[in-house]
């Protein structure tokens, strides 16, 4: 039997997302001249489809369906991402010249969201054949053994970071890959060398795009005072950026969080959603949550989210199948890193990456892809010893 608690927790988060979409999209509906329930109705539709998808997948036989679904997501979405730059304008939506969404029946679908789930399954399936067999292996042999995955990852990251101009997804997938490598049995020394290599690639991606440099400067302008206090004055002045670099989004996000206080301003009573924070019902949903529902509301959502992750990790820990073990771990890591990257970004701890919050942010692609991941984990949970 599939894990009912996990199903209930995910359904709860989806229900919360519908409420947040309604209350936080007030200004956006006016801006676009649509009905006040426009985004809430769409998110409700996405929510019901997602819950139904989870339920259907949970009924499946993991021995027969898990691999076909995983590889279909991996290969199918990869092909779509590669083909998107060559598709006509009426089939794709572009932002800043980057084509990220495919238009289907009045909705936009982002293949990268489904690629992440398929990529995690591909890694789990591949790593499971090498699980725990690195003992006594030198670091050179480890690099040779895992080189094919590095090639696949670099190819995927090139498409996502350069073609689709989406570095945030690279960060989430890169972190997931690194930690899955460690759980798959690679040595700690190998893990550290890959981590350093990933950091070098990350810096390369940042400094090859002007808009990313501006975003880093915007974040650093806000964070620099508290950090530079730790350095000697001569070094601190060299690292300081001009104060005219305005961290607009981060500043308003922090103001929204501060304005919410302990108990919040109350549902629909938020101020910063009224044009001060763009996309507050998507990328800044946690800031909107903090303003209207306060610290208590955020704490409740974090509790539900952490409980969901705990159930996913429990399924992984109770499984004797190494593929299911690694896939469940990978899904838990993927969702956790997405949540953390968003939370750190809107609170000014790290630069904003444009990553949505799983099951909470408005958007069909994100919630549906995450639902595929949860549905596959629930399907796999029938092979785990949960009792």
Segments from the language model and where they lie:
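Hydrophobic, glycine- and aromatic-enriched re-entrant/interface helices and adjoining loop segments
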Residues: 101, 194-295
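Loop-to-helix entry and N-terminal half of a specific, functionally important transmembrane alpha helix
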Residues: 312-354, 360
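Hydrophobic alpha-helical transmembrane segments
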Residues: 45-53, 291-312
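Hydrophobic alpha-helical segments of polytopic membrane proteins
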Residues: 70-76, 147-160, 167-207, 219
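Membrane-helix boundary/helix-loop-helix interface segments in multi-pass membrane proteins
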Residues: 4-5, 19-22, 26-164, 343, ...
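Interfacial segments of multi-pass membrane proteins
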Residues: 171, 175-190, 268-293, 355-368
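Alpha-helical transmembrane segments of multi-pass membrane proteins
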Residues: 13, 47-51, 80-84, 114-125, 157, 173-177, 302-306, ...
């Amino acid at each position: 039997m599939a894990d009912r608690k996990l199903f209930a927790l995910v359904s709860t988060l989806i229900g919360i997302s519908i409420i947040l979409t309604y209350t936080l999209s007030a200004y956006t509906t006016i801006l676009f001249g649509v009905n006040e329930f426009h985004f809430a109705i769409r998110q409700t539709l996405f929510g019901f489809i997602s819950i139904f998808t989870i339920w259907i997948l949970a009924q499946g036989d993991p021995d027969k369906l898990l691999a076909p679904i995983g590889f279909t997501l991996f290969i199918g979405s990869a092909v779509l991402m590669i083909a998107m730059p060559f598709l006509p304008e009426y089939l794709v939506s572009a932002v800043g010249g980057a084509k990220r969404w495919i238009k289907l029946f009045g909705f936009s679908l982002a293949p990268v969201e489904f690629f992440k789930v398929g990529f995690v399954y591909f890694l789990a399936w591949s790593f499971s054949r090498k699980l725990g067999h690195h003992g006594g292996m030198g670091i050179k042999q480890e690099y040779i053994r895992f080189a094919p995955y590095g090639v696949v990852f670099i190819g995927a990251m090139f498409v996502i970071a350069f073609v689709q101009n989406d570095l945030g997804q690279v960060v989430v997938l890169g972190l997931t890959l690194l930690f899955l490598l460690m759980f798959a049995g690679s040595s700690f020394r190998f893990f550290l060398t890959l981590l350093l290599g990933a950091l070098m690639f990350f810096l390369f991606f940042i400094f090859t795009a002007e808009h990313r440099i501006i975003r880093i400067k915007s974040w650093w302008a806000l964070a620099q005072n508290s950090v530079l206090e730790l350095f000697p004055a001569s070094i601190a002045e060299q690292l300081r950026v001009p104060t005219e670099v305005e961290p607009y989004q981060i500043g308003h996000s922090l103001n929204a969080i501060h304005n919410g206080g302990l108990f919040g301003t109350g549902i629909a009573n938020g101020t910063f959603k009224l044009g001060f924070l763009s996309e507050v019902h998507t990328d800044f949903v946690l800031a909107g949550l903090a303003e209207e529902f306060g610290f208590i509301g955020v704490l409740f959502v974090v509790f539900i989210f952490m409980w969901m992750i705990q159930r996913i990790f429990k399924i992984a820990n109770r499984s004797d199948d190494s593929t299911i073990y690694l896939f469940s771990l990978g899904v838990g890591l993927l969702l956790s890193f997405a949540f953390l990257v968003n939370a750190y970004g809107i609170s000014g701890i790290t630069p904003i990456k444009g990553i949505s919050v799983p099951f909470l942010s408005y958007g069909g692609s994100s919630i549906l892809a995450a639902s595929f991941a949860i549905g596959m984990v629930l399907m796999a949970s029938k092979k785990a010893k949960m009792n």
